[in-house]
């Protein structure tokens, strides 16, 4: 009887937890789709500009070059004026097509999409996990999944599917591999040793916000958070391994019947063609990186600054996006050709065209988003809010580390209702970046705090479209026919990872704060630092 009570206790906890998640889901479903949300925000920005037109505020503008502090007065402008209306109607195409995130994603998704289409990413994931020994499989899956978001959701879901098969073949409960990979992949939105799509999107959003406000954009690049995120990737690998052993594995339990999983065991084995493709891709990657290093070595290299340096600002850093595009293009082509997926080079243009399909949804959202950001900046509302908010923060003395803890908490909360990391940042960046910049904090530091909160609750966001896929995988790899997996299964088992992610990354940020470490190449936490 006692044993039966203990077995039912987790189900009661899941039931109480699911009620909370269901409430979040109900609220989240009431939010409009991002396209309509940004359309509504355009109207809100116009109304606010009319109501508060003429309001003024002053603030001290810090110099990123270490110069004297300048006192600046900002006035909110009424957007319903001839100049603004005619400019928008005459330049809608340029506002849209010059929207930094869309321009950047359009280029990068060509090559990343090629790697996905040819099967390179999938084969690489299988190769990495398949080589892991049982003793370190938890850590390997966590590390690979954390870094899999370089290939966006496709990478995360690819690792998740393969992890279920591999765990079953090794005698573990497949659910453990699925949930570990899914949680780790989502946490990787703020922890990655590689540069991914989200880095490109966020740097583009930051540039769109900073440039019109006169904020120095020399340190607003795709590597602005790289040192911090790389460290988080390593630390979270250890943290996720510990959470898996200590909490999740005991909760899930051992597998009851692995016969179905063992029949599906071959799904994680590489074919001969995939092995050939991976060898070719690896060789091409080595050659590509060797050539790049060789080009950068000479003091007069065209990738170096005029003074011969690479950090903090140089053509190399400004070319990261193009270099990433070429890297994925070269490796994707090498894999596709050698694996037999690309039989003739005439097929390449069609494959690149197919890659753009993954960007169509973002292109639609980018239309109202680009107009909103332009109008919001043109009204001077973000600068005004930054001046008023910065002044209030100064007057209260609440300008230290606790401020960024609150930013992370805000991001964590919003993530439960709006899962698109770029869409949330499009809304928050125009407010938070200027507000915190006026009191001496760099856009990169503000971005880090936002990304910590954003990644922590990704795996437990009820409105995520990936949840249905994960529930389907749990059903496929279900070794206990008496249990039926559902959304509550996903959220309850991912909650320990979510809490651990937030705590661990905030502690890492605390260390960064105390030691005043750079967040990325040439990127300080403080303005002029």
What are these regions (language model features)?
Residues 1-29, 59-80, 249-276, 525-529:
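Intrinsically disordered, low-complexity non-transmembrane regions of multi-pass membrane transporters
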Residues 105-107, 133-164, 169, 363-369, ...:
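Hydrophobic alpha-helical transmembrane segments of multi-pass integral membrane proteins
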Residues 4, 31-43, 47, 67-122, ...:
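Core transmembrane alpha-helical segments of multi-pass membrane transporters/permeases
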Residues 13-31, 88-92, 125, 215-220, ...:
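Cytosolic juxtamembrane amphipathic/interface segments immediately preceding
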Residues 51-83, 198-202, 300-308, 379-388, ...:
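Interfacial/capping segments of alpha-helical transmembrane domains
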Residues 25, 29, 160-255, 271-276, ...:
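Membrane-core helix-loop-helix motifs of multi-pass transport proteins
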Residues 37-53, 105-113, 144-146, 184-188, ...:
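Hydrophobic core segments of alpha-helical transmembrane domains in multi-pass membrane transport
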Residues 19-20, 58-98, 212-221, 297-315, ...:
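Interfacial loop/helix-cap signal at membrane boundaries in integral membrane proteins
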């Amino acid at each position: 009887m006692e044993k039966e009570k203990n077995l039912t206790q987790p189900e009661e906890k899941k039931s109480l937890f699911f009620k909370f998640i269901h409430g979040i889901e109900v609220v989240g479903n009431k939010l409009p789709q991002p396209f309509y949300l940004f359309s509504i925000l355009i109207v809100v920005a116009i109304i606010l500009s009319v109501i508060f037109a003429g309001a003024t505020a002053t603030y001290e503008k810090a110099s990123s070059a270490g110069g004297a502090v300048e006192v600046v007065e900002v006035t909110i402008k009424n957007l319903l004026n001839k100049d603004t209306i005619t400019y928008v109607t005459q330049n809608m195409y340029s506002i849209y097509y010059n929207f930094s995130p869309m321009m950047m994603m359009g280029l990068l998704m060509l090559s990343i999409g090629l790697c996905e289409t040819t099967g390179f990413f999938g084969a690489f994931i299988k190769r990495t996990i398949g080589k892991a020994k049982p003793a370190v499989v938890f850590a390997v899956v966590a590390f690979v999944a954390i870094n899999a978001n370089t290939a966006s959701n496709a990478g995360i879901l690819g690792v998740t599917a393969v992890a279920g098969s591999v765990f079953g073949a090794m005698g573990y409960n497949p659910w453990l591999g699925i949930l570990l990979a899914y949680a780790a992949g989502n946490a990787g939105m703020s922890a990655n040793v590689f540069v991914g799509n989200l880095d490109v999107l966020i740097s583009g959003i930051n540039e769109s916000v900073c440039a019109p406000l006169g904020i120095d954009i020399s340190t607003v690049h795709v590597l602005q958070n790289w040192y911090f995120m790389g460290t988080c990737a390593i630390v979270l690998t250890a943290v996720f391994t510990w959470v898996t052993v200590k909490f999740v594995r005991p909760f899930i339990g051992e597998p009851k019947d692995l016969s179905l999983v063992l029949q599906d065991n071959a799904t994680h084995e590489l074919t001969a063609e995939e092995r050939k493709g991976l060898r070719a891709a690896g060789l091409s990657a080595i050659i590509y990186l060797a050539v790049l290093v060789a080009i950068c070595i000479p003091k007069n290299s065209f990738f170096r600054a005029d003074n011969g340096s690479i950090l903090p600002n140089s053509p190399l850093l400004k070319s990261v996006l193009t270099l990433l595009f070429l890297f994925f293009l070269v490796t994707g082509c090498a894999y596709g050709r050698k694996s037999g997926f690309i039989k003739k080079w005439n097929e390449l243009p069609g494959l690149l065209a197919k890659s753009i399909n993954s960007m169509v949804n973002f292109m639609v959202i980018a239309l109202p988003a680009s107009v909103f950001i332009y109008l919001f900046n043109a009204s001077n509302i973000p600068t005004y809010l930054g001046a008023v908010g910065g002044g209030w923060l100064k007057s209260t003395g609440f300008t230290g580390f606790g401020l960024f803890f609150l930013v992370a908490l805000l991001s964590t909360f919003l993530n439960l209702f709006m899962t698109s990391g770029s869409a949330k940042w499009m809304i928050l960046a125009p407010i938070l970046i200027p507000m915190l910049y006026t009191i001496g904090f760099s856009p990169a530091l503000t971005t880090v705090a936002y990304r910590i909160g954003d990644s922590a609750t990704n795996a437990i966001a009820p409105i995520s479209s990936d949840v249905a896929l994960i529930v389907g995988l749990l059903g496929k790899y279900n070794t206990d026919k008496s249990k039926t997996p559902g959304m509550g299964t996903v959220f309850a088992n991912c909650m320990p990872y979510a809490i651990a992610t937030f705590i661990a990354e905030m502690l890492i940020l605390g260390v960064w704060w105390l030691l005043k470490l750079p967040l990325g190449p040439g990127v300080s936490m403080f303005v002029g630092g």
